[in-house]
Amino acid sequence: MKPNDKVIIGRLARPYGLRGWIKVVSFTHPIDNLLNHPTWQIQHNNEWQPLKLQAGKLHEPFLVVKLENIDDPETAKHYTNDLIAIERRALGALKEGDYYWTDLIGLAVVNTHGIELGTVDSLIETGSNDVLVVRSKERERLIPYTSYTIQSIDLEKKIIVVEWDADF
């Protein structure tokens, strides 16, 4: 799988129990969405390898999963902190103007005056709206992801234009 063909959807945490189950930190919303994908790509020892999901259940704030051929805690331990990805084509199509968070991470953020504010490091879900975490060398900014604040997103040019004061 080429880097652009996959989307990171979570991370394997630590072993859970004695039968090879593993805790998972999900990057999806809701967190159990990643259980909808029967085969995961796991980045193990810097190589992507497919692993089949045998079972999974919600154990908040984590998921716990049983993956094929991982049958004991010692084997499960070797997968600690490995990234979980799926093929991009497994994601549903989005409506015009909607974006997957993963596509926004790494984009440059500039305000409407052309001042560079940094790059999108991550997103935070809050009760009222999502928030872009924008990092530069100097600071971190939390910019609301609202129709007023976000003026445009250009995935090809890798840029987000925001209505945001550079001093905030």
Swiss-Prot record:
Entry-linked Gene3D superfamilies: PRC-barrel domain, RimM
Residue span, PRC barrel domain: 96-168
MF (Gene Ontology): ribosome binding
GO CC term, one of those recorded: ribosome
Recorded superkingdom: Bacteria
Keyword Ribonucleoprotein: no
Entries under InterPro entries matching the protein: PRC_barrel-like_sf, PRC_RimM, RimM, RimM_N, RimM_N_sf, Transl_B-barrel_sf
Cellular location(s): Cytoplasm
Purpose of the protein: An accessory protein needed during the final step in the assembly of 30S ribosomal subunit, possibly for assembly of the head region. Essential for efficient processing of 16S rRNA. May be needed both before and after RbfA during the maturation of 16S rRNA. It has affinity for free ribosomal 30S subunits but not for 70S ribosomes.
Family per similarity comment: Belongs to the RimM family.
Name of the protein in question: Ribosome maturation factor RimM
Organism: Coxiella burnetii (strain RSA 331 / Henzerling II)
Gene name as annotated: rimM
